[in-house]
Amino acid sequence: MTDLVPLRRALLSVSDKTGLVPLGQALAARGVELLSTGGTAKALREAGLDVVDVSDVTGFPEMMDGRVKTLHPKVHGGLLALRDNAAHVSAMERHGIGAIDLLVVNLYPFEATVAAGADYAACIENIDIGGPAMIRAAAKNHSFVTVLTDVEDYEALLGELEAREGATGYPFRQKMALNAYARTAAYDAAVSGWMTDALAEVAPRRRAVAGTLAQTLRYGENPHQGAAFYVDGSDRPGVATAVQHQGKELSYNNINDTDAAFELVAEFAPEDGPACAIIKHANPCGVARGATLAEAYTKAFQCDQTSAFGGIIALNRPLDGPTAEAISGIFTEVVIAPGADETARAVFAAKKNLRLLTTEGLPDPKAPALTVRQVSGGYLVQDKDNGNIGWDDLKVVTKRAPSEAEIADLLFAWKVAKHVKSNAIVYVKDGATVGVGAGQMSRVDSARIAARKSADMAEALGLETPLIQGSVVASDAFFPFPDGLLTAAEAGATAVIQPGGSMRDVEVIAAADAAGLAMVFTGMRHFRH
């Protein structure tokens, strides 16, 4: 192995031809011989460059509809041969194999083909075979071969050649080899993931998780932790696909909280009215519907004004001027919405630190997806919690049935509870949260905390009666004892929604009847950890 390897011969075979011609011209200007295949060779020739077809090197034409182009010893031998190994050099001479110093390959657009909704056969045809084989060969032999798999690396190569007078150094080749192996790993992960979905495999024997670096973050949850943001290439609207119009770079916590906020607000379809969710530390501190977006924000903000400071705001409709004006009254880290009109953007222009993201759509809360969580020595995979219920799914278990207004609020509270860390208790009144208890080890403590925060907020707003009076309450899991339910009743709740299923359901139902509560069971739990 030597540090500097002059580039004399390069093989270029790319699907994405962005930057191809300038790269070819720069290499040719340095006297590098260009080998190529199919459309890549055609593009280079049309630019006036001399190109040797790989089929002329191998003595075999491209065949089987292009499935076989580069799978030949004269290609792979040129990539894999150790230049300081006498036996390898002798074999190259005997078989007329020329060394290849540079490989430039990007792969068939398999991921884009799948994303476009192509049928099974079309996806199969877009699985690259020769490309990954060459990439892996060149990467393995990075002691002597430079391999490029990303258009973004072309300029880096030209800079390296300029700095090293037409050669590449070992550190550069090693870095490009790492990029190459990461690319083939991600490509294979995409193929295996697609086939897993196509075969409806719930738990395949092996599962690969891959992503592309979107942003190197200043730090993680805390300043002493390194962090980065990777995207998986899916087109689900959200923080990964959003356009940032202003403000500082997103932090690790911003990204995590913004995702939580947007997924929550997407539970409320825009055609059913404007909705707003305010998130702090991945938990909602206010969620509401309103006649206007500004009203929805104001109602959500009134749930817990203290916690909303420095929070994340998500909207289910494009941000407008009046809503932007209302939001501007408090320090906010991020606002995410399907869009933002010019008036709203002009209002926010004065808030230099506020990050405004738009997504051109909402994520589908019913779309199948997976959630992945790392544990020591492995990771957990599960279906995304897309569980939802309607009026017809509710089972009235108390003597008093809830009114239509109570049912509307119960269903609203149930949607919110799904997005609150367990144990979750959510009080709702008139389409707005009025108390949220999250993340407590005891369900009754969550009920008490939510009630106390509502009372504190009423005092801060100068209200004689806490908003929690006449509210409904949702619990993400069953009440194991009557105490949590009775705490809610004492706070002013009139109706309850919960999964049911406790050994003490009969006792809890009796307590609800004694307190004059209406209660419905959903038969569905929404634990969130």
Swiss-Prot record:
What this protein catalyses is: (6R)-10-formyltetrahydrofolate + 5-amino-1-(5-phospho-beta-D-ribosyl)imidazole-4-carboxamide = 5-formamido-1-(5-phospho-D-ribosyl)imidazole-4-carboxamide + (6S)-5,6,7,8-tetrahydrofolate; IMP + H2O = 5-formamido-1-(5-phospho-D-ribosyl)imidazole-4-carboxamide
Q: In which pathway does it act?
A: Purine metabolism; IMP biosynthesis via de novo pathway; 5-formamido-1-(5-phospho-D-ribosyl)imidazole-4-carboxamide from 5-amino-1-(5-phospho-D-ribosyl)imidazole-4-carboxamide (10-formyl THF route): step 1/1; Purine metabolism; IMP biosynthesis via de novo pathway; IMP from 5-formamido-1-(5-phospho-D-ribosyl)imidazole-4-carboxamide: step 1/1
Q: Does the keyword Coiled coil apply?
A: no
- Organism of origin is Dinoroseobacter shibae (strain DSM 16493 / NCIMB 14021 / DFL 12)
Record has Nucleus as a keyword = no
Q: What is this protein called?
A: Bifunctional purine biosynthesis protein PurH
**GO molecular-function term, one example from the UniProt record:** IMP cyclohydrolase activity
Q: Which residues form the MGS-like domain?
A: 2-149
Stored HAMAP family: PurH (MF_00139)
Gene Ontology biological process: 'de novo' IMP biosynthetic process
Q: Domain comment, in the record's words?
A: The IMP cyclohydrolase activity resides in the N-terminal region.
Q: Which domain of life is it from?
A: Bacteria
Q: Which GO terms describe its cellular component?
A: cytosol
Q: Which PANTHER family match?
A: BIFUNCTIONAL PURINE BIOSYNTHESIS PROTEIN ATIC (PTHR11692:SF0), BIFUNCTIONAL PURINE BIOSYNTHESIS PROTEIN PURH (PTHR11692)
The similarity comment for this entry is: Belongs to the PurH family.
What's its EC? 2.1.2.3, 3.5.4.10
Entries under CDD domains matching the protein: IMPCH (cd01421)
